[in-house]
């Protein structure tokens, strides 16, 4: 069961920060939005409780790496998150000016509306880009995602994904338990 604190305080405060920065990112040009997003996440991220879990998981996954490498990798995670979050405010312009899907022998079958295909995608930056790229070529695209923990933020993210990216199938998030 969700705690009253999360419902009445934490989620609304996170949502206000989200809307504030989303608006700032929307006003700024894409390049400046990315720089600000990176500045925010690399400055704040290491002080959040989740940072300890990030360090622990990186240390387990890369047990042969030294502490300096682990810390650098964690910083790159925060940098990537800032880059990605700032791009949410610019999804429309990214879709119009930054994405080019080139047809080839494989994509011809995938983009045929009469065929069914499963595409497995990995990403190292903005996880919305593959869905946006596919959506630019065909309308019926779905994705399986994990929703943000905050239901207020999740509502906005769902709207953005529906408008610019994919129909979503979601997995249960920790907030649902």
Predicted regions and their residues:
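Conserved beta-strand termini and adjacent loop/short-helix elements that scaffold enzyme active sites
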Residues: 102-104, 144-146, 171
């Amino acid at each position: 069961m969700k705690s009253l604190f999360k419902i009445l305080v934490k989620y609304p405060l996170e949502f206000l920060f989200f809307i504030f920065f989303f608006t700032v990112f929307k006003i700024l040009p894409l390049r400046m939005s990315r720089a600000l997003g990176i500045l925010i996440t690399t400055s704040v991220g290491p002080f959040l409780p989740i940072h300890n879990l990030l360090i622990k998981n990186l240390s387990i996954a890369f047990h042969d790496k030294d502490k300096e490498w682990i810390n650098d990798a964690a910083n790159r995670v925060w940098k990537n998150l800032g880059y990605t979050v700032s791009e949410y405010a610019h999804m429309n312009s990214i879709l119009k000016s930054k994405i080019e899907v080139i047809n080839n022998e494989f994509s011809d079958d995938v983009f045929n509306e009469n065929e069914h295909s499963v595409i497995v995608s990995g990403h190292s930056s903005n996880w919305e880009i593959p869905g946006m790229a596919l959506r630019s070529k065909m309308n019926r695209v779905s994705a399986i995602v994990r929703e943000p923990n905050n239901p207020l933020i999740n509502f906005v993210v769902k709207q953005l994904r529906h408008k610019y990216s994919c129909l979503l199938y979601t997995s249960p998030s920790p907030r649902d338990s």
